[in-house]
Amino acid sequence: VLIRDAEVEGQRRDVRVEGHHIAAIGRLSLRPGEPVIEACGGALLPGLHDHHIHLAAVAARRSSVQCGPPEVTDAEGLARALQVPGSGWLRAIGFHESVTSGQLPDAATLDRMVPERPLRLQHRTGRMWLLNSRALDELLAVAPPPPGLEHEGNRYTGRLFDEDAWLQQALGSVPPDFAAVSAELARFGVTGVTDMSPRNDPVIARHFAQQRAEGRLLQSTVLAGALAMADAPQSGWRLGPLKLHLHEAALPDFDEALAFVRAGHAQGRALAVHCVTEVELVFTLALLDAAGSLPGDRVEHVSVASPELVAQMVNLGLHACVQPHFIAERGDRYLADVEPQHHGDLYRLRTLLKAGLALAGGSDAPYGSADPWRAMAAAVSRTTPMGAAIGPEEALTPEQAMALYLADPLDLSRQRRIAPGEPADLCLLDRPWASARSRLDSGDVAVTIASGRLVHQRVDQTPFERLARADSPA
């Protein structure tokens, strides 16, 4: 394939793709029978990589009811949203306790909203499910109660904490198909993903491999997850970090966590730690200080970080995977819930960059938008849904925001480029970068090529041509 007259790093160039790689860049002659994409001066970028996503949860979301802000903001709205025709299990997502005046509903409360069918309502964090009585009855009929099922005396409240594996087993769940999610990511110009689910194991790895082999998952894939992932055959995916998901209210035993980190390091795997509170970050830094850091060890989210903790991250040589769009999606809630003295510590960007930390961007979808262009725009604006600014001094330039999604997924300190020999993972915009940088809009993506294969082209144009005159010499 010849991509003709594209803007590559500010220069008008032709780019030839052969097989899975970029073969040549420059002013190139068309070969007989060679397909052509007319770029017309549009910016050609390396394909974007989402460095933190939960693909199975994103796929499951498509058959779920949204039950949290901004769509649902109060208990009456929650009750209305849950009035879905049908029978059998009702899966609802996105709940936040602000909807119910700061209280987590129990089974009896949910029974008043959904009395006739089993309901499971997921908290926005992804770490908690709220079950009505019918759901409790069905689940406990096939599986013994797990430790994470809250009870008051002899009564189960229906609040289930950190028990996704138990829930999936009790429900007899099978991994979802990724085709629709993958096509949507391709529309955004995403050619690679790192799935950060801490429960990833050899079983789910086989599903990823099958989806890749069948062409249903178009993006190159890195899988983080459990220690057992190191023993899984790497077919269609590459092994990523060991994932540790901390929760401030129930931190693990320090020595047990230390042994976990050392076991991962012994596999040659970096550690990726979920840190959304200051306490979780302090715990992580102490853990890696004791274990000794490995190149590539990384902090996910870095939601709250004082300058002192940032300095410790630098001293340990850590990387950071950030979600700038959380400010644009939830910023007003942060301003209400987080103590004012910590507002400046929320979702830092420029401070991390200036300190020398390698940064990458991840959507955390479905817990945030999967559109990386929204995250880029949020990194530049730092504004909440209501228009308030959070840490405007932490804003990035459009180029710095874009760079979050151009990092090498196995080495966040390296930026991928368009160069001969590099993988043919490409994102072509319909306009030059000078115009696109002021918009940062996924609607500007005209063509996406993943591993040399056209996986998206916008419906309002037909960029592929086969020029008849090239089939015979002049």
Indicate where each model-derived feature is located.
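Divalent metal-binding segments
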Residues: L2-L217, A228, L244-R262, Q267-V276, ...
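Extended hydrophobic/aromatic segments used for targeting, binding, or gating
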Residues: A209-G240, A311, S442, S451
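Short, well-ordered coil/turn segments that N-cap beta-strands
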Residues: G88, P115-R117, V190-T191, G215-T221, ...
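His/Asp/Glu-enriched, well-ordered alpha-helical/loop segment
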Residues: R262-A272, V279-D297, H301-V302, P307, ...
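Non-cysteine beta-strand/loop elements that form the S-adenosyl-L-methionine
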Residues: H54, G236-H247, L318-A328
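A structural microfeature
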Residues: A23-A24, A446-V447, H456
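A cross-family glycoside hydrolase active-site/sugar-binding cleft signature
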Residues: I93, Q122, D195-M196, S220-A226, ...
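Glycine- and charge-enriched low-complexity intrinsically disordered segments
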Residues: Q457-D471
